[in-house]
Swiss-Prot record:
The keyword Repressor does not apply. PROSITE patterns: C_TYPE_LECTIN_1 (PS00615), C_TYPE_LECTIN_2 (PS50041). GO terms for biological process: endocytosis; NK T cell activation. Residues 70-548 are extracellular. This is C-type lectin domain family 4 member F. GO terms for cellular component: plasma membrane. The gene is Clec4f. Residues 438-538 form the C-type lectin domain.
């Protein structure tokens, strides 16, 4: 891969003979976010290697420049060794020694000059390398700025993803709380409905019972009033009889007259207080009991005076009758008192039931309001669920898009070629047709099928260097051609793709027929056991890739 350029809108990849531009769909910055860390690492590694190279070059230059030329004076010429052994020949050899030293010095100067020229060349080479390194550093600096911008953009995208994850978590928590509230409200609503039904039944039965009891009490009151009127008449008669007997018992019946007067007053007060039953009934009962006592005393006195007052026998019988009637009235008053207490209890029960009914109505209104709020909350939760579903679909689509892009880049890196929505692999090895199909299958593809004139032209142009197997065969179905990838074979459209007099189904010396097809300029049937390069075809459905 010679070149790779990235920007926010497009990714362009070039090899020796093709370029592919990828334009992502949907959320574009996220697709570049995964490539940014790899590019940054590559740039950092290259920059580090270049810096190390420059440092070593400078060290080498410094070491070479810091070593000056030093004459090796400790090495004496062979002629000087004879100086100590032959003193007499010193004058004869002095001229020879000087010439020898001069030659050695000249040779060393020449060596120094050669070393200086080589050092100068190394310095020039290092300067040239330094210039190249500087230009590369500048280029890498510009690329590093672009990468930093992409990294910043990637960080923003990651922040947005984090915020989206937090929002999704919050929505899930709200959904769980709302579900629990809905479940609780449903239980409360069912309890309220059951309580309302029970209250209605109780109110209905209580109302019926109260109506019946009130009806019975009304009749009892009417009967009591009639009996009281009768008692009043009886008391009036008794008063008349008492006034008649008062003259006969003037001396001996003073106490009886006072008691009868007390009874008369008590009966009158009882008659007046019968209109207000709650308070006067108690007073009337006490007066009646008191009258009963007086009547009993009167009866005893009358029994004691029976011998003396034979003329008053009729009065005694009437008094006994009145006494019996008063006892009956007392019993009826006791009954009326109990009935009134029962009526008061019923009234309190009715009031309590009415308050319970009012409270139930209030609770029903509250439950209705809660139900409306629950419905609104349910609608809101449904909307949030729909929004969450849309976000999940968008994330899934983005993941699928990223996966497809990675597949495309991987195929391009493996020398697959893109054309018109499909990827093609042109092999350099040679295999029989069946082995070639196995290889294509192992790559998730099949031997290529041809369905259009443009695809035929593309294969012809790419396979011009030699014959290549394609996925057309009639093996096992002689004369009925089919594509191995399942694509329907269009015989009429494919007639122009065959070579002259092809297919001819030639029989080879080994008896094998030509049941498979290879292509160079046109199609030709060939024995399937022959070895040729092949063309694999893989459909990806990637619509955003374009051939540059």
């Amino acid at each position: 891969m010679k070149e790779a350029e990235l920007n926010r809108d497009m990714a362009r990849y070039c090899t020796d003979n093709q370029c592919v531009s990828l334009q992502p769909q949907g959320l574009g910055p996220k697709s570049a976010a995964l490539m940014a860390p790899r590019t940054l690492r590559h740039v950092q590694v290259i920059l580090a290697l270049m810096v190390v190279t420059v440092i070593f070059s400078l060290l080498a230059l410094f070491v070479v420049a810091s070593q000056p030329w030093r004459p090796e004076w400790n090495k004496e010429p062979p002629s000087l060794l004879l100086r100590g052994s032959n003193n007499s020949g010193h004058d004869n050899h002095s001229q020879f020694v000087r010439e020898t030293e001069m030659q050695v010095a000249i040779q060393r100067l020449r060596d120094y000059e050669e070393n200086s020229s080589s050092c100068h060349k190394e310095v020039q080479i290092l300067k040239y390398q330094m210039d190249n390194v500087s230009s590369l550093v500048q280029l890498l600096g510009s690329h590093l700025e672009d990468v930093n911008a992409d990294i910043l953009q990637t960080k923003d995208v990651l922040k947005e993803s984090g915020a989206l994850a937090l929002e999704t978590q919050a929505l899930r928590s709200s959904l769980e709380v709302a579900s629990a509230d809905i479940h609780s409200l449903r239980g409360d609503l069912e309890k309220a409905n059951a309580m309302t039904s029970q209250t209605r039944g109780l109110l209905k039965s209580s109302t019926e019972n109260t109506s019946a009891e009130l009806h019975v009490l009304g009749r009892g009151l009417e009967e009591a009033q009639s009996e009281i009127q009768a008692l009043r008449g009886s008391l009036q008669s008794a008063n008349d009889l008492s006034s008649q007997t008062q003259g006969f018992l003037q001396h001996s019946m003073d106490n009886i007259s006072a008691q009868i007067q007390t009874v008369r007053d008590g009966m009158e007060r009882a008659g007046e207080k019968m209109n207000s039953l709650k308070k006067e009934l108690e007073t009337l009962t006490a007066q009646t009991q008191k009258a009963n006592g007086h009547l009993e005393q009167t009866d005893a006195q009358i029994q004691g005076l029976k011998a003396e007052l034979k003329s008053t026998s009729s009065l005694n019988s009437r008094i006994e009758v009145v006494n019996g009637q008063m006892k009956d009235a007392s019993r009826e008053l006791q009954t009326l008192r109990r009935d009134l207490s029962d009526v008061s209890a019923l009234k309190s029960n009715v009031q309590m039931l009415q308050s319970n009914l009012q409270r139930a109505k209030t609770e029903m209104q509250t439950l209705k309001a809660d139900l409306q709020a629950t419905k609104a909350l349910t609608a809101k939760i449904q909307g949030e669920q729909n929004r969450l579903g849309a976000l999940q679909e968008a994330v899934a689509a983005q993941k699928q898009e990223q996966k497809t892009q990675n597949q495309v880049l991987q195929l391009i890196a493996q020398n697959w070629k893109y054309f018109n929505g499909n990827f093609y692999y042109f092999s350099r090895d040679k295999k029989p047709w069946r082995e070639a199909e196995k290889f294509c299958t192992s790559q998730g593809a099949h031997l290529a099928s041809v369905t259009s004139q443009e695809e035929q032209a593309f294969l012809v142009q790419t396979t011009s260097s030699g014959d290549h197997w394609i996925g057309l065969t009639d093996q096992g179905t002689e004369g009925i051609w089919r594509w191995v990838d399942g694509t329907p074979f269009n015989n009429a459209q494919s007639k122009g793709f065959w070579g002259k007099n092809q297919p001819d189904n030639w029989r080879h010396r080994n008896g094998e027929r030509e049941d498979c097809v290879h292509v160079r300029q046109q199609w030709n049937d060939m024995a399937c056991g022959s070895s040729y390069p092949w063309v694999c075809k893989k459909s990806t459905g990637w619509s955003a890739a374009r051939v540059g």
